[in-house]
UniProtKB/Swiss-Prot annotation:
Record membrane topology: Peripheral membrane protein
Subunit structure: Subunit of the heterotrimeric GatFAB amidotransferase (AdT) complex, composed of A, B and F subunits.
Xref: InterPro entries: GatF
GO biological process, one term: glutaminyl-tRNAGln biosynthesis via transamidation
Pfam families on file: GatF (PF20977)
Name of the gene: GTF1
Example of a GO MF term: ATP binding
Reactions it catalyzes: L-glutamyl-tRNA(Gln) + L-glutamine + ATP + H2O = L-glutaminyl-tRNA(Gln) + L-glutamate + ADP + phosphate + H(+)
Family under the similarity heading: Belongs to the GatF family.
Keywords: ATP-binding, Ligase, Membrane, Mitochondrion, Mitochondrion inner membrane, Nucleotide-binding, Protein biosynthesis, Transit peptide
Protein name: Glutamyl-tRNA(Gln) amidotransferase subunit F, mitochondrial
Domain of life of the native organism: Eukaryota
Species annotation: Candida albicans (strain WO-1) (Yeast)
GO cellular component: glutamyl-tRNA(Gln) amidotransferase complex; mitochondrial inner membrane
Compartment(s): Mitochondrion inner membrane
Length: 165
């Protein structure tokens, strides 16, 4: 009874398909050359979801920001980016059959951004700002920085006398 249960469990766990025994190198090559699944099966765009679409305008803006020239085939780049976005969203979904976007995906959209223009630019650091920061700098004992003056060093000084022989 144990052996039947074990073999049944093993068959269910290891694979839902049964393969014939592959004995030669040629049979293995032929088997691996056949496509048994496609990533498009996993990456079906859910209908009615609020998934952001990558538009050709976004592709042109990203190319401009990266310093690359405009591509002749923007359609393929747009399609590739849309597939990548679907794949990333698929990674954040626990249930593969969901139609509505998951809360994890929504949290992710708030953290990761594609375009630099979505971020607030910082004010450039100038020399006067650096000098002001240096003047306001104080030693921090938690970092092991100790405040001392030159008189503290002179007080604990020592002298080495050499004898001539």
């Amino acid at each position: 009874m144990k052996s039947i249960l074990r073999s049944t469990t093993r068959n269910l766990i290891t694979s839902s398909r049964r393969f014939e025994n592959l004995k030669t190198t040629e049979e293995i090559r032929n088997f691996l050359a056949e496509s048994t699944w496609s990533i498009n099966e996993l990456l079906k765009s859910p209908t009615g979801s609020s998934q952001p679409e990558v538009s050709p305008e976004i592709v042109k803006k990203m190319l401009k920001l990266s310093g690359l020239n405009d591509l002749k085939d923007d359609q393929s780049v747009t399609k590739a980016l849309n597939l990548q976005m679907m794949f990333i969203n698929h990674l954040y979904d626990n249930d593969h059959e969901t139609v509505t976007p998951s809360p994890k995906r929504n949290e992710n959209n708030g953290i990761f951004r594609l375009l630099a223009s979505d971020h607030l630019p910082q004010r450039p650091l100038e020399l006067n700002d650096l000098l002001k920061q240096i003047n306001e700098l104080k030693p921090d004992p938690s970092k092991g920085e100790v405040d001392f003056t030159i008189s503290d060093l002179q007080r604990d000084s020592f002298v080495i006398n050499k004898r001539k022989e």
